Regions:
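A detector of single, family-specific signature residues
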Residues: 1-214
Length: 214
């Protein structure tokens, strides 16, 4: 690392899965660093800088790196990608993106995205998984209702109603279900119960995290 790297005022980082592009400027806005670096070396590399402002787009992985750099003492600014795009001067590539991030970060009117701490990240992750489970459960419920209609069996809407009615359908030996279709409905019932149990676990975890951080 050259001496100029130690005088960086603002460092823009275009984050990726493996290769990161860095663009550093001094207090006058002059570029003094243009560097590509692999993920495994990024933290140690930036730790050698004098404390500066580090700007990144608020994309996947940004909150993790923001926390890493904050622990090193740097000031971190996250910017929504839509606000960085207007500052890309030429063709879009990693180097130009990193430069655009710096340009956007020094604008007085720029709005920044708060860095999520680990607990906030946990809650967001749980909510995302919960949303997916709810979507998949809804698809399962719709499939259960459609399949039963093929056997002349109507099941009302709503997760709780579908669950209780499907159990009754499986246990009812007088309906048109064959051994094969009854086994299928039993499997669908078990799948629905599993969704309910997973959703309850997630909701319990969210409440626990919120309680621990009150």
């Amino acid at each position: 690392m050259g001496d100029s790297s130690m005088n960086i005022s603002v460092l823009g980082i275009d984050i990726a899965k493996n290769i990161f592009q860095l663009h550093g400027v001094d207090s006058s806005g002059k570029r003094i660093l243009k560097q590509r670096i692999v993920r495994e070396q990024l933290s140690a590399y930036v730790a050698n800088f004098q404390l500066c402002t580090i700007a990144m787009e608020s994309c996947v992985g940004a909150n993790y790196w923001a926390r890493v750099f904050q622990r090193q003492g740097h000031i971190v600014k996250l910017i929504s990608p839509q606000f960085v795009k207007p500052f890309v001067k030429t063709n879009k590539n990693d180097a130009n993106d990193a430069e655009a991030i710096v340009e956007a970060s020094i604008r007085p009117s720029m709005h920044f995205v708060p860095v999520k701490q680990v607990e906030q990240q946990d809650i967001q992750s749980l909510h995302r998984v919960r949303s997916r489970l709810v979507k998949n459960r809804t698809a399962l419920i719709n499939e259960i209702r459609r399949l039963n209609l093929e056997y002349g069996i109507t099941i009302p809407q709503g997760a709780l109603k579908v669950k209780s009615h499907l159990r009754s359908v499986v246990d009812d030996k007088e309906n048109e279900l064959t051994i094969s279709s009854r086994e299928l409905m039993e499997e669908l019932y078990d799948e629905l119960v599993e969704f309910e149990e997973r959703l309850k676990k997630i909701e319990k975890k969210v409440k626990l995290i919120c309680k621990e951080n009150d």
